[in-house]
Amino acid sequence: MGDETLDRQRFARLYPTKNNRFQAEWHLTDTKLLDAVKIALPPLRVVPIVFVPGIMGSNLSDLRNEPVWLLNNVKNIPANLVYNWSRRDAGARQLLLHPKRTQVYTLGAVPKEKSASIGNAQEFTRRGWGEVSEVSYHKFLLWLDKKMNGEHNPALWDDFSNDSLGRAKTIGEKLASKLPAGLVMRMANLPDFSERNLPVEAVTSDELLKRSKARFPIYAFGYNWLASNKIAAQSLRERIEKIISENNVGTVRCSQVILVTHSMGGLVARACNLLPEMSKKIVGIVHGVMPATGAAVAYRRCKIGMRDEDFGAGLVIGSDGKEVTAVFAQSPGALQLLPSEAYGPGWLEIADPTGKCIAVLPKADPYEEIYLQREAWWGLINEEWLNPMQGKAIKWDELAKNVKLAKEFHRSISGKYHANTYVFYGGGEDIGSYSKVRWNTKKGLPPMNNRGEPATTIPRKKHSEIRTDGSNNLYVGGERIVRTAMRGDSAVQITTETSEWEIRCAGKNSAGDGTVPAQSGRAPRQTSPMSIKQQFELSGIQHEPAYRDSPIAQAITYYAITKLAALADLT
């Protein structure tokens, strides 16, 4: 009879209010139902989880609070964003997407239904969910909330198992079940090995018992990804301090947070961790697909855009080099994604028609040798593209200032990580990436005035000596010839490009996630092994949807948070 009575019990879920008090909702039922509705008090210790998105993953508005970059979900894509930006040229992009003319937009879409710990739209907004991409992140954040806050009895966390434990079948058995200490647990979907066949440290029941003593409200932190990540780091510090403060009310106690980052958000979090007293307020950090030392594809996009890399993304980010440069050059945050000195030398190559490299850069300093190379055609920025039609031109000096900020930022975080850091990154050849950018050359259709210059002269050419429209079509010498021909009764125009040499940027050449090469993703353990608790290489993972679409990435994040929860100060 005891179990039958327990099985009939009814429970109402408590949701925290903005003042960290709790409230429950219950609909009136038939008077024949006399069983009491029970409310279980959640733990009074709080360790908030703060999600920090990647570049372009935060919603932005202009200074009148009109959205200019809004990642709301329409049939699993940011359809309105794609439509709006696909119609904007380089000038419009330059006008709208400037760090001093934009700010974080806080009123993006939020979930319509309750989550495990959030009871209404206002609370989602207050916790920052409206600041970040609904398309890329909300599905994951809802999943994480359910995992961390859906059940407080560790004996009922079905992702963790041990053969010595029986499985409760009835509600009564579940309510009475307790997890014993001293067990080594198996975790669902967790890989057996991290990287280089290194073993994964198991979760113990003691860690689960420690985790069960706290709540883990899920917050999101949007930032202006056009501005320097140094500024974003300072804003993150302010948000963390605010979150800790608001979770210290009455008998509720909070002293630390856990950070989970995506892509460039990892650079923001690392910089924040270096600010005074912040490492003590952060239990640890989980980094996903972070360009730890930069990504060479950032250079490639400045030169030829994204059309041949990803047509759909190119409509938004920029189909050609002119559209990308218009925003990139005036945005310190974007420039901070370029390969740093720690990325290493020799990632930019120019090859002759036989495949032999005739130029390899940088030798040491990518900032002076490539990013501020003003004359050479292979320099990061074509100065003419700083002044697009209908835009608001920036001068070379402003670009130089932004590159200097990137250099200083890179050096400030180089090799520096929180003492409790977990990492996962894309590896293997399934997706591929660009560890190097390679310019291939071949003989063009000879012009009338062909001078017969050898390929070895190509690296010495200036911007003015190269013809390009910002796509992956560059020409040395020659001209564009347009002629009219008849096809049946119709006249059509035929375009022919003559040149001494044609130059094309090669495709993917290394393991990675499509954006970040494995050599950058794995850099944390190589440069700071004592700070890295576990580092996972995942084959087949894609960069933008890493948290949304990869069950293994989700499991690793859940594992890392569980490990970090056991290290939290719950006094």
Which residue ranges define each predicted feature?
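C-terminal subdomain of alpha/beta-hydrolase-fold enzymes, centered on the catalytic histidine
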Residues: 384-571
